[in-house]
Every structure is written in C-alpha cells, then in structure tokens.
Amino acid sequence: MAAAHLLRASRVWARWHPRALPVLRRPGGFSIREYAKKPVGKGGKGGVAAEALKDPEVCTDPTQLTTHAMGVNIYKEGQDVALKADSEYPTWLFQVNLGPPKKLEELEPESREYWRLLRKQNIWRHNRLSKNKKL
C-alpha cells in the first residue's frame, strides 16, 4: 500500500502520466516514416526564391568620414560613433601592436608573452609530430 502511494507520488512529481507511454505497434507490423512536405515557392526547381542581399550604403562625405567612425554602429537605428580627441582615449590604445606578431627571439625570456608563445609553438610541434603516428 505504501509502495503504491510512493510510486504514484513519484509519477506526479516527475509529471509522468500513463497516457504518455508510447503505443507499441503490433508484432510484424511495418513502421512508415513520413517526411515533411517541401515548401512550395516561386522560382526554379523545388526551392523558395530568396531575396537578393543588399550591400550597406557607402558614405562618401569627407567631413563625415573624418569626424565619425563609419560602420561601427551595430544597431539598425541610431547614428555612427563620433570620434573623440586623442587625449580622451587611454594610452595603451596607441601602444597596441597592429603589425605581424613578434617572433620568439624578439621577446624577453622573462616576460609572460615569451612563455605563452613558447608553449604554443611546442603544442604545434607536438601536434605535427603526432599527426603521423598510428593508433
């Protein structure tokens, strides 16, 4: 009796209903898979006609190009970001390396960047060597 109450309570707690059980098909019966119908659309062979993609508008105004960061606004509405004076930006922004990455020989051996690059190169070397090994 107590087991029946416990079983019933666990079914209610798990939101399990006897009607939710799958219906067993009869032995020897075939199951047929029905695929969804393809959407009917205008155009070529069996596909929906896609809308042509448009390129963004290109600004050619020289004053707008020199005072605003064009294309930085990610929202549909709103204006582009206005550029500020250099003194309003942090100093580290002008020290960012925009060129090719430094080689291992150019870095100081006591720096964190040196050890990160050394580890990365060792991982690349290990991956290259282990690529040809058989299982």
UniProtKB/Swiss-Prot annotation:
> GO CC: one term?
mitochondrial inner membrane
UniProt lists the gene as Mrpl54
UniProt keyword terms in alphabetical order = Mitochondrion, Ribonucleoprotein, Ribosomal protein, Transit peptide
Q: Tell me the InterPro entries matching this sequence.
A: Ribosomal_mL54
Classify the source by domain of life. Answer: Eukaryota
Q: Which Pfam families match?
A: Ribosomal_L37 (PF08561)
Q: What is its quaternary makeup?
A: Component of the mitochondrial ribosome large subunit (39S) which comprises a 16S rRNA and about 50 distinct proteins.
Which segment is the transit peptide? 1-14
> Which family is it part of?
Belongs to the mitochondrion-specific ribosomal protein mL54 family.
Subcellular location per UniProt equals: Mitochondrion
- What GO biological process term is on the record, naming one? mitochondrial translation
* Organism per entry: Mus musculus (Mouse)
Question: Any idea what this protein is called?
Answer: Large ribosomal subunit protein mL54
